[in-house]
Amino acid sequence: MARPKKVVKKKEKKSVPVGIAHIQASFNNTIITFTDTRGNAVSWASSGQSGFKGSRKSTPFAAQVAAETAARKAQDNGMRTVGIYVQGPGSGREAAMRAISAAGMKVAFIRDVTPIPHNGCRPPKRRRV
């Protein structure tokens, strides 16, 4: 006997006029997440998700494309003003910030939240190429 079909509710879009853009730029990838002011994710994108593979993920252009994608999704949810938190030493930091402001979003503030150790873990040894 056939089971009755489950009724699936369509995900309703949140209207979030003010939010926060978190840019996490590592040496290998750049991840951009747009959240509301309480920290709930509204949209996100990364260099890898945007179609870049391998060493091309760490380029500024890949970060720019990812930031444009995430900003477009956030604007669909009504986001107009953002504060930017940047974390990490990656090459995509500046490109991602520029792409967010170029997408038509008003940037309220930019804050660097890169964790700096007070002589914590031993860093990886230097590469000899």
Swiss-Prot record:
<keyword id="KW-0699">rRNA-binding</keyword>
<dbReference type="GO" id="GO:1990904">
    <property type="term" value="C:ribonucleoprotein complex"/>
</dbReference>
<comment type="subunit">
    <text>Part of the 30S ribosomal subunit. Interacts with proteins S7 and S18. Binds to IF-3.</text>
</comment>
<keyword id="KW-0687">Ribonucleoprotein</keyword>
<dbReference type="GO" id="GO:0005840">
    <property type="term" value="C:ribosome"/>
</dbReference>
<keyword id="KW-0689">Ribosomal protein</keyword>
<dbReference type="GO" id="GO:0006412">
    <property type="term" value="P:translation"/>
</dbReference>
<dbReference type="Pfam" id="PF00411">
    <property type="entry name" value="Ribosomal_S11"/>
</dbReference>
<keyword id="KW-0694">RNA-binding</keyword>
<dbReference type="InterPro" id="IPR001971">
    <property type="entry name" value="Ribosomal_uS11"/>
</dbReference>
<dbReference type="GO" id="GO:0019843">
    <property type="term" value="F:rRNA binding"/>
</dbReference>
<dbReference type="InterPro" id="IPR018102">
    <property type="entry name" value="Ribosomal_uS11_CS"/>
</dbReference>
<comment type="function">
    <text>Located on the platform of the 30S subunit, it bridges several disparate RNA helices of the 16S rRNA. Forms part of the Shine-Dalgarno cleft in the 70S ribosome.</text>
</comment>
<dbReference type="InterPro" id="IPR036967">
    <property type="entry name" value="Ribosomal_uS11_sf"/>
</dbReference>
<dbReference type="InterPro" id="IPR019981">
    <property type="entry name" value="Ribosomal_uS11_bac-type"/>
</dbReference>
<dbReference type="GO" id="GO:0003735">
    <property type="term" value="F:structural constituent of ribosome"/>
</dbReference>
<comment type="similarity">
    <text>Belongs to the universal ribosomal protein uS11 family.</text>
</comment>
<protein>
    <recommendedName>
        <fullName>Small ribosomal subunit protein uS11</fullName>
    </recommendedName>
</protein>
